[in-house]
């Protein structure tokens, strides 16, 4: 009995140690020993040097190795130059968790945001200082029209993101859902074209039209399912499969019923 109790106690201790060790695993983010006393520019420079420079270069010139290694989205090099991308691109990739990448070969994908809002603002300011570029947009969906946004979204976006912004797969690339993106992140994505998404300039989609597109996306985040069940909200594919399933069950039941009656006759 005493040995059993000792074994159980030892197991609990080891489990506790393992739990603590797991909780203290580093996230892989390099931070200054103390962020206090650092100006925003200094903090951004140190965070950039520790987490971004390996792929994007010390001065944002990008990394283009002689062997022409290509990264995610077939981008030449480990990381593209950041000179001239402005605060817009940095804010988008950091607030969505697209960056930093654990592997330059993988497709950027929304994941847990690794930096605090203060750190994101610092890195964004530092990247913006590398060269003149676009600032963070300030969209106003309330000034847009949902009906106009629906037509614009159908024309420019639904081919990849589906009619109600549920995302999908296009040319071996996952297309993200838009329902968890903020208005600012949507506006940023439209202007920079992350991964395989095309870039839409203000000549292609004006700020006024962009407000309407965002207003439509906001409206489909909580759709009114008049039929009672949205079936995924991704269009005719699940609806057709559900219809065929119901029809197949009904036909089999009808065949069984007819067979039973013919057997009795």
Which residues make up each language-model segment?
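Hydrophobic secretory-pathway targeting helix
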Residues: 1-34
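Inter-heme linker and motif-flanking segments adjacent to c-type heme-binding CXXCH motifs
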Residues: 61-62, 130-144, 158-159, 163-173, ...
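C-terminal capping alpha-helices of c-type cytochrome domains
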Residues: 19-24, 112-136, 202-264
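Detector for the c-type heme attachment site
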Residues: 49, 55-64, 83-87, 95, ...
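Sequence/structural segment immediately N-terminal to covalent heme-attachment motifs in c-type
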Residues: 38-56, 143-164
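Extracytoplasmic electron-transfer domains, predominantly the class I c-type cytochrome c fold
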Residues: 72-130, 172-225
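N-terminal export and membrane-targeting signals
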Residues: 1-10, 39, 237-247, 265
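Intrinsic disorder/low-complexity detector
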Residues: 28-40, 125-147
């Amino acid at each position: 009995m005493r040995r059993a109790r000792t074994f159980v106690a030892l197991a609990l201790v080891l489990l506790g140690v393992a739990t603590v060790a797991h909780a203290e695993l580093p996230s892989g983010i390099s931070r200054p020993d103390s962020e206090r006393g650092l100006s925003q520019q200094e903090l951004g420079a140190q965070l950039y040097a520790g987490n971004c420079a390996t792929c994007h270069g010390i001065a944002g010139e990008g990394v283009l190795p002689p062997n022409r290694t290509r990264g995610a989205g077939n981008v030449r090099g480990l990381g593209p130059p950041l000179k001239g991308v402005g605060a817009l691109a940095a804010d988008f990739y950091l607030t969505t968790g697209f960056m930093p990448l654990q592997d330059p070969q993988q497709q950027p994908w929304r994941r847990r945001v690794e930096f605090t809002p203060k750190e994101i603002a610092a890195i964004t300011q530092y990247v913006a200082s590398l060269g003149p570029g676009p600032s963070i947009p300030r969209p106003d969906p309330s000034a847009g029209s949902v009906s106009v946004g629906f037509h614009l979204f159908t024309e420019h976006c639904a081919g990849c993101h589906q009619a109600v912004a549920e995302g999908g797969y296009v040319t071996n690339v996952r297309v993200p859902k838009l329902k968890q993106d903020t208005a600012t992140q949507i506006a940023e994505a439209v202007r920079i074209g992350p991964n395989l998404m095309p870039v839409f300039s203000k000549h292609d989609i004006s700020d006024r039209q962009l407000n309407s597109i965002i207003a439509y996306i906001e409206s489909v985040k909580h759709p009114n399912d008049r039929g009672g069940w949205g079936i995924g909200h991704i269009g005719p594919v699940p609806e057709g499969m559900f219809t065929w399933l119901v029809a197949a069950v009904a036909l089999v039941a009808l065949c069984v019923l007819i067979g039973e009656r013919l057997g009795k006759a």
